[in-house]
Amino acid sequence: AYLFGGVNIRWSCDPSMLKEKDDTPPKADFHFPGGLKDYLAASLDGEFQVTREVFAGKSEKQGGHGSLEWAVTWYGGDGFLSSYCNTIPTHEGGTHEAGFRNVLTRGLKAYAELTGNKRASIVNSEDVMISAAGMLSVFIREPEFVGQTKDRLATVEAIRIVENAIRDPFDHWLAANPQEATKLLDWVVARADERVRRRQEKE
C-alpha cells in the first residue's frame, strides 16, 4: 500500500486459520495517503528524530520510466534503507541506492560549504547514512538485476535518475529549513567525528 499512495488495501482472513499467538489480525485496512512518507513516519512513531520533518518527494515522468518516490529522516537508531525497483524489493541495494547516498552526501556537504561549516569536510556517505531511515522506490524500463533473485539493481542509469530527481529538492529543503538543516549537519558531523576517533584508536 505504501508504494502506491492513496490506494486502500483491505485484508481479511478466516480467524480459524490463525494460530493462537499469531499477531495477524483477521481484518485490516492498509492505507498510506502520503505513500512512503506516511509509512516511514508511522514506522518511526515514538523514536527520537533529528529533524521534525521527513524529507520526502516524488518525481513523475511521462510513461513511468525514471519516476521515483523517496522519504528519509535521521534518528537515534541504526540506519536502514528500504529500496524497490518497479515494486520489487531490492534487499541488497544497487545503483539506485548508490545515487541516493551520493545526492544526500553531496547536498549536505554543499550546504556546509555554503554556511561556512568547515568541520563537515571529513563527512562521507557512511556518516550520512549510518543513522538515516530511508525508503526509495524507482520505476525503470527494462531494469537489470544482479542474479536471478533480483535483490540488487545493476542499471547504471539509475544513479543519474535518482541524483537528478533529488538534488534540487534536497538543496531547497535544506535552504528553507536552516535551523533543521544545521541540526542535521551537526548530527552528521558528530557521526564523522566518532568514525575518525575509532579509526585513530585502532591505529
Regions found by a protein language model. Give the residues of each.
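GHKL-family ATPase ATP-binding module
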Residues: 1-203
